[in-house]
Amino acid sequence: MRVLITGTSSGIGREIADKFLEEGHTVTGIDRREESIQKDGYTHICMDIRDKAKYPELEPFDIVINNAGVQNEDDIDVNLKGTIGITEKYGIHPGIKAVLMIGSA
């Protein structure tokens, strides 16, 4: 399957990406920080999910996992608006199997 995961540079997002890669899936990670995963089947997009104008055109995904999040004054823009933007751009199409939202505080 083709999987898109936001927030893959560390923590939960990185662990989820590693698990999908171990199972042989193709993973695209989006994060503000540079690539931290160096494995076959992984593609990294370094960008801020708040900037919808920079969302690249990508082939459809089977699974979209919204994991990126912050705990500061930008929380609404990242945790809510960024999640909505990613879901609208990549998670709404025929053939999508799942869209997951991860949140923590």
Predicted regions: what is each one?
Residues 98-105:
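Catalytic loop of short-chain dehydrogenase/reductase
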Residues 9-18:
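N-terminal Rossmann NAD(P)H-binding glycine-rich loop of SDR-like oxidoreductase domains
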Residues 43-60:
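Conserved Rossmann-fold cofactor-binding substructure of NAD(P)-dependent oxidoreductases
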Residues 23-37:
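Conserved glycine-rich Rossmann-like NAD(P)H-binding loop of the short-chain dehydrogenase/reductase
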Residues 67-72, 103:
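Conserved NAD(P)H cofactor-binding loop of Rossmann-fold oxidoreductase domains
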Residues 87-88:
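A short, exposed helix-loop element centered on a Lys and neighboring polar residues
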Residues 3-7:
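Conserved N-terminal Rossmann-fold NAD(P)-binding element of oxidoreductases
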